[in-house]
Amino acid sequence: MMVHCAGCERPILDRFLLNVLDRAWHIKCVQCCECKTNLSEKCFSREGKLYCKNDFFRRFGTKCAGCAQGISPSDLVRKARSKVFHLNCFTCMVCNKQLSTGEELYVIDENKFVCKDDYLSSSSLKEGSLNSVSSCTDRSLSPDLQDALQDDPKETDNSTSSDKETANNENEEQNSGTKRRGPRTTIKAKQLETLKAAFAATPKPTRHIREQLAQETGLNMRVIQVWFQNRRSKERRMKQLSALGARRHAFFRSPRRMRPLGGRLDESEMLGSTPYTYYGDYQGDYYAPGSNYDFFAHGPPSQAQSPADSSFLAASGPGSTPLGALEPPLAGPHAADNPRFTDMISHPDTPSPEPGLPGTLHPMPGEVFSGGPSPPFPMSGTSGYSGPLSHPNPELNEAAVW
């Protein structure tokens, strides 16, 4: 039975043949379909076709993101994010310098690079979409460096204008949702500690201090400046929040408290417009329940008042005496005209508490009514209260009790 070649499909009449892909081949038919080179030791196949090593990786292997050519397994490559580049293709598009591993660079249009020095010194690339590749993965700071390209050569110490520019950039980012963010710069923990220590010493560092920090940390001066701006903005927000919290705390923790029942009250709040007096926090002797001491304002009460509305007390409590109802007369020239006192004055046989001249009023001690000493205030007909009472009232007169 004749054996046919898998390449030319002709019978194999040669003494030697090659077995590729479990099929017999002429020696001359085992060749690369691209370069027509005979393959004797090793070959690659795809879709039934044979390829040499170089052509196979060039056609089906990983493509270089710079030149769009295939990458051979023996070639040295550099990777930036998910892209792979030849060494010769991994160069700065401005100065054509080959970029080494770990060096910070900026990717433009996904396949072009700008080294750090050229990026910072150039102002013509701000319209491109920028991406940064860094070897550090600890902590990140993402300032908007797209708008800062033209500000770097003209960097000044005016931090106020820088803060305004940062606020404007934030507003622009909020307004345009499709706007891409700037490159992400990584800050290590040690660098962050250095920046925090410098901020604690000087919240608004000068250009000279920023240059020193750039030398110590290895960060860009613009990154340091933006970090300080963000830090100052954060401090201001924290102060505003703390001040607002303190005001709210004072408002909710210190409301207008209700006065205790035993506390002092102002006479206008306690008495209002009534003509009667009020006893305050008197620390001395006090009136026992049922005592018949009472005081009323100057002038006789009107006849329309009922006994409950007036200041007269009936002697029906435990402090009553054999004298019956004690009603002190009003002091003044119209005391005899009051019908309440006509009966008391017209009866000469009314018992008197102690001997004396008829018609003479004598003060009676408080022990008779309450079992204790009388309150320490003078029995005067014209002077107002003073001393232990809570408030003076010059218009209030006092009548003697008999």
UniProtKB/Swiss-Prot annotation:
PANTHER family found in the cross-reference section: LIM/HOMEOBOX PROTEIN LHX, LIM_HOMEOBOX PROTEIN LHX5
Which GO biological-process labels does this protein carry?
cell proliferation in forebrain; cerebellar Purkinje cell differentiation; cerebellar Purkinje cell-granule cell precursor cell signaling; forebrain neuron differentiation; hippocampus development; neuroblast proliferation; neuron differentiation; positive regulation of DNA-templated transcription
For this UniProt record, give its keywords in alphabetical order, as a comma-separated list.
Answer: DNA-binding, Homeobox, LIM domain, Metal-binding, Nucleus, Repeat, Transcription, Transcription regulation, Zinc
PROSITE patterns named among the record's database cross-references: HOMEOBOX_1 (PS00027), HOMEOBOX_2 (PS50071), LIM_DOMAIN_1 (PS00478), LIM_DOMAIN_2 (PS50023)
Q: Where is the composition biased (Low complexity)?
A: 124-135, 300-311, 322-336
Q: Where in the cell is it found?
A: Nucleus
All residue ranges annotated as the LIM zinc-binding domain in the record: 3-61, 62-125
Give the protein's function: Plays an essential role in the regulation of neuronal differentiation and migration during development of the central nervous system.
What residue ranges does this record give for the DNA-binding region? Answer: 180-239
Keyword Transmembrane annotated = no
**Expression across tissues:** Expressed in fetal brain and in various regions of the adult central nervous system including the spinal cord, the thalamus, and the cerebellum.
Pfam families (UniProt xref):
Homeodomain (PF00046), LIM (PF00412)
Which species is listed as the source? Answer: Homo sapiens
> What protein name does the entry list?
LIM/homeobox protein Lhx5
Q: Which gene encodes it?
A: LHX5
The keyword Secreted is assigned to this record: no
Mention one GO molecular function: RNA polymerase II transcription regulatory region sequence-specific DNA binding
- Composition bias (Basic and acidic residues) maps to 151-167
Tell me which GO cellular component terms the UniProt record holds. Answer: chromatin; nucleus
Which parts of the sequence are annotated with region: Disordered? 124-186, 298-402
